[in-house]
Amino acid sequence: MLELRPNCECCDKDLPADTATAYICSFECTFCAECNDQYLHLTCPNCGGELVRRPRRPAAKLVNHPASLQRIFNPDLKATLGKGR
């Protein structure tokens, strides 16, 4: 089952479980649409894998299968990507 991490690893933007603007790779590295469009271009900066839209979990299922609360944020990532890595 997907973790549904709560934030973008690049900019720390909140990404609720029901958002349509989250992207993940096969390792569930999680990014927002803005960082994907500006820096990542559908490629995970951590593993080099493909980024795809993260599916939304129906609200009724979140009761028994909640999204993760663990935030993963790399403040250096955005600076590195902004330099044309």
Predicted regions and their residues:
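Intrinsically disordered, low-complexity regulatory regions in eukaryotic proteins
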Residues: 1-85
